[in-house]
Amino acid sequence: MTKVKICGITTLEDALMAVEAGADALGFVFFEKSPRYIGPEAAARIIRELPPFVQVVGLFVNAELDFVNRTADTCGLDLVQLHGEESPAYCGLVRRRVMKAFRVRGAESLAALADYKVSAYLLDAYSPASHGGTGERFDWDHAVAAKGQGRIVLAGGLDPDNVAQAVAKVAPYAVDVSSGVELSPGRKDPEKVRRLIAEAKKIALI
């Protein structure tokens, strides 16, 4: 069954709602230029209130390695998501499992995956203006082609209306959704979250 990560969590209310709806993982954005940014101390307070067995992911963009590792320790992160131009060597120095994000323009965007030995590869739509959370889609055929590299996490423009189609086509390890389930940047719509998770997970039941 495809796993679901709800990213851009900024409040305890949204975190607990997403977990209750069946989210497997929650994402916290530690990139100050993002409208979904949350500071490490604020994130840690939310994370301490979560029930067990929920994976906690920290998203970073071209951050200093020391900041990444300190934040991982402060927050008790299970996984670090790197959304910038971090090198394979940098990934190897992170003291957590790493999910490396790649912004997909076309098939040529997939060549770099082979250079990275990480826990998962997140594929997102390319945007010159943003490192994710744009609500834009890319050609899912590229995600299908990338599956030979390892665990694929599908992102980019997913919402309750198209996630079942995406899961049926790609059969990714997980889907990662932020703007597709929001009321406004950083605040989640409970109905959209519940519907998206149900749609993403129903494929395995058919």
From Swiss-Prot:
Superkingdom as given in the UniProt entry: Bacteria
Any single GO BP term: L-tryptophan biosynthetic process
Entry-linked Pfam families: PRAI
EC code(s) of this entry: 5.3.1.24
Keywords: Amino-acid biosynthesis, Aromatic amino acid biosynthesis, Isomerase, Tryptophan biosynthesis
Top EC class for this record: isomerase
Pathway: Amino-acid biosynthesis; L-tryptophan biosynthesis; L-tryptophan from chorismate: step 3/5
InterPro entries hit by this protein: Aldolase_TIM, PRAI_dom, RibuloseP-bd_barrel, TrpF_fam
GO molecular function: phosphoribosylanthranilate isomerase activity
Catalyzed reactions: N-(5-phospho-beta-D-ribosyl)anthranilate = 1-(2-carboxyphenylamino)-1-deoxy-D-ribulose 5-phosphate
Signal peptide: none
CDD domains per the UniProt record, alphabetical: PRAI
Family named by the database record: Belongs to the TrpF family.
PANTHER family attached to this UniProt entry: N-(5'-PHOSPHORIBOSYL)ANTHRANILATE ISOMERASE (PTHR42894:SF1)
NCBIfam families, per the entry: PRK01222.1-4
Protein name in UniProt: N-(5'-phosphoribosyl)anthranilate isomerase
Annotated organism of origin: Citrifermentans bemidjiense (strain ATCC BAA-1014 / DSM 16622 / JCM 12645 / Bem) (Geobacter bemidjiensis)
